[in-house]
UniProtKB/Swiss-Prot annotation:
Native source species: Methanocaldococcus jannaschii (strain ATCC 43067 / DSM 2661 / JAL-1 / JCM 10045 / NBRC 100440) (Methanococcus jannaschii)
Cellular compartment(s): Cytoplasm
Record's protein name: RNA 3'-terminal phosphate cyclase
Active site residues according to the UniProt entry: H304 (tele-amp-histidine intermediate)
Family matches, as HAMAP family: RTC
Protein encoded by which gene: rtcA
Amino acid sequence: MDFIVIDGSYLEGGGQIIRTAVSLSALTQKPVKIINIRKKRKNKGLAPQHVSAVKAVKKLCNAEVFGLNVGSEELTFIPSKLSPKDFTIDIGTAGSISLVIQTLLPLSLGINKKFTVKIKGGTDVKRAPPIDYVKNVTLKILRNFGVLTELKVLKRGFYPEGGGEVIFEVKPSKIKKFDLIEHSKSNLVEGISYVQNLDESIARRMRKKAVDLLNKEKLLPNIKIECSKGISTGAGIVLWNDTLGGSCLGEKGLRAEIVAERAVNELLKERESGMALDKYMGDQIIPFLAFGKGIVGVSEITNHTKTNMWVVKHFLDVDFEIKEYKENNCNGFTIEVV
């Protein structure tokens, strides 16, 4: 049997290599072996959220898998035919639900009937997109290009206890050709300022600060407040401006106003580039761009984006052309499939 062998320590050598490789292995029916998994990280090998993501894909394609345990630095994934089914996956920690969703998303392009998965873990955790970004930026953009999904957030989960719960539905999808270079210039900034097990005044302070800062920029803020109870405690704010996002997670000792300011600044920096996609969406879109072809505009090319292109090229006969883009007061890059 011929395996695609992928070096998991390439560039930033993170979990994204595993997510993209396993997803594309299931989609293309090509077996893959990933070596040196997260070799440069302090905690080497697979983390619980990676194990959960691989298990989810394994369920959907009856794969044979070797090395699927926390800490494993080598993983072999041998897929069979995709056969959608409903199931529940419990990451068992505050491991990121968003990153499991990222792994399942491309499978929409290879299934013949819908599946629904209940995922338990962390909805709003460090080093992962917040669940409201996934819902209002990632999935919305992909829906416009034919990727059909629904996401319901039932409970929020924060580090370390987790306890978040979502229902994620994926339907058979046919990807359209991408043509998404410049931002729409929409002035509407929507958002959610949320707290769990904390005083509502914190959410109100985050919203007030964000609204004041956005008004100064002549933008139109529409930010909702959400207060909930759960087994974990946390706060944060997520903003979105059509196809761009900005967010910040609350931390002990970090004033509500600072949290809001960081989220607003992140969004404004992305808006300044004039490009359609922010740096996070720039890497998430790569597998879909490979299948749909076409061109997208991004604010910057990150190592995550380069890594995703590199992994995709192991499975698909595609090449990506990156060019600087300076038209119409924009300052970013285009990525085109050639």
